[in-house]
């Protein structure tokens, strides 16, 4: 996004007059007038390509192909210590001016699982499975993002209300077992013989008390005590293996009355804007794919990206029409600059949401670990006429590259240094935020997590621009709540002008600097 200021030659409406050409397939130099190799121009907008806002749903029937992601907690974690990024952003001071009350933030992601610490969660629809409401998170990603934006604090004193949570779904690729027929035979008749009680012993009159048992033997060696539950119990670990957990306190044979309900243990975690409402829209999932094999002419991976671009465009329009004044898109798509697919609908959608509906759209810069997300050049001092290196772009990230309407966020560490091997640079990066030391709400229970299940019974530490975008979305919500009279354009302008700038003033890794909620 270009830096907004007095005298700028760019405005949000300046690109909306003509139909896009750059968004049509750019494969193999097919676009007339496009410089050779990887050189591209900023995208243009065709408002007439706006997709309709119908009931959310996938473009084709889908099915679950993989098991849902499990989550965990890293050894030695102390959630009573505030995450480093919260200290870096000085949120306690920022909250003196408000906590985002009254602002709706749409999270277009993998869905958000209900949690007691997300009390204002609104179902926004599902573009992965027909009939869904957006409140299922198989990938354990959208819930993390939403909680970093909006999780309420827990002081441990007041019990949080329980919330319904759907069971974790399983893949539908396995053949169901054949039906079984069970034949029930009648129970054969039984003969019961009643034996009369023996007569009383001689010398004992009828009705006299029966002699008691003999006294116990004298004290001596005692037999082993009865096992009341001590020992060990086998429980599943995060990746489906087994581990042994010791049980130190055996069950009490005489339990007392239950203790009054208590809240969760106090911790230092909170979302950036705990007063906001979250609209959850599930637009993507790595665990789901087409129900029927793809039979078109395009490469299946290209066809999948085309569908993802279309559903993302529809999700943005739907979020804007639901009243979201901030739209967070952490799950972005990368593609080669030599093969940019048609994005007219997506361009029209971000223009509609930002200009017509006055929503602040925040998107991640993209992570190098994702498919097709190869790093872009940072800056070429030999090209002073191209300070943001548009002519050197090798990877396009969408919708992030619609820089006139989308605030794109790069990732830094807790010291403010760019995550250069992870965060995808680009001329559209406008701001940055911490992307490490991630803590969030669990999509599987009422607790906190800071890890996800990895291979070979390992835990993976989440990090990257997805969570940097969540932080900036939270800060944007704080500013919207404090200054409701400001437009989305003015909110973005304020955020990039108050960011902590890099040495050059702006660069393709961190944009105009690290977001500052109290500036």
Give the role of each language-model region.
Residues 101-105, 274-279, 321-327, 355-361, ...:
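Loop/turn elements at helix/coil->beta-strand transitions in domains of secreted/extracellular proteins
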Residues 204, 287-398, 458-463, 467:
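Substrate-binding/access-modulating region of protease and related hydrolase catalytic domains
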């Amino acid at each position: 996004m270009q830096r907004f200021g007095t005298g700028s030659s760019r405005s949000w409406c300046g690109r909306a007059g003509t139909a896009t050409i750059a968004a049509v397939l750019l494969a193999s130099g097919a676009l007339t007038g496009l410089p050779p190799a990887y050189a591209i121009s900023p995208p243009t907008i065709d408002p007439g390509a706006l997709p309709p806002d119908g009931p959310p749903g996938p473009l084709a029937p889908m099915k679950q192909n993989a098991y849902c992601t499990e989550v965990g907690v890293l050894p030695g974690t102390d959630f009573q210590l505030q995450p480093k990024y919260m200290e870096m952003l000085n949120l306690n001071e920022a909250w003196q001016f408000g906590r985002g009350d009254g602002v709706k933030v749409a999270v277009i992601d993998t869905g958000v699982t209900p949690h007691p610490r997300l009390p204002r969660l609104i179902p926004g629809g599902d573009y992965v499975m027909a009939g869904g409401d957006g409140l299922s998170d198989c990938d354990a990603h959208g819930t993390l993002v939403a909680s970093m934006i909006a999780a309420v604090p827990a002081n441990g004193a007041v019990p949080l209300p329980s919330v319904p949570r759907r069971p974790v779904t399983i893949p539908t690729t396995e053949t169901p077992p054949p039906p079984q027929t069970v034949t029930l035979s009648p129970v054969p008749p039984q003969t019961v013989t009643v034996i009369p009680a023996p007569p009383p012993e001689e010398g004992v009159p009828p009705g006299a008390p029966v002699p008691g048992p003999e006294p116990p033997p004298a004290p001596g060696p005692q037999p082993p005590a009865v096992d009341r539950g001590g020992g060990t119990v086998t429980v599943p670990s995060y990746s489906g293996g087994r581990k042994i957990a010791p049980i130190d306190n055996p069950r009490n044979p005489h339990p007392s009355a239950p203790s009054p309900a208590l809240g969760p243990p106090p911790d230092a975690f909170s979302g950036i804007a705990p007063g906001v409402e979250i609209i959850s829209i599930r637009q993507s999932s790595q665990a789901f794919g087409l129900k029927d094999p793809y039979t078109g002419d395009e490469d299946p991976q290209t066809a999948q990206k085309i569908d993802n671009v279309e559903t993302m465009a529809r999700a943005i329009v739907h979020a804007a029409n639901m009243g979201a004044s901030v739209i967070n898109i952490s799950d972005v798509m990368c593609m080669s600059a030599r093969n940019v697919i048609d994005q007219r609908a997506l361009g029209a959608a971000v223009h509609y949401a930002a200009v017509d509906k006055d929503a602040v759209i925040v998107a991640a810069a993209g992570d190098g670990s994702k498919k097709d997300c190869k790093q872009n050049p940072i800056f070429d001092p030999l090209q002073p006429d191209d300070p943001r290196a548009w002519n050197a772009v090798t990877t396009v990230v969408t919708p992030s590259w619609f820089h006139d309407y989308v605030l794109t966020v790069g990732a830094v560490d807790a010291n403010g240094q760019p995550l250069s091997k992870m965060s995808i640079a680009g001329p559209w990066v406008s701001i940055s935020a911490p992307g490490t030391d991630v803590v969030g709400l669990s999509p599987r229970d009422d607790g906190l997590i800071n890890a996800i299940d990895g291979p070979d019974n390992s835990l993976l530490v989440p990090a990257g621009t997805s969570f940097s975008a969540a932080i900036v979305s939270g800060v944007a919500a704080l500013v919207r709540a404090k200054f409701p009279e400001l437009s989305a354009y003015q909110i973005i302008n304020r955020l990039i002008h108050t960011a902590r700038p890099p040495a050059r003033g702006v660069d393709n890794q961190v944009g105009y600097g690290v977001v500052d909620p109290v500036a």
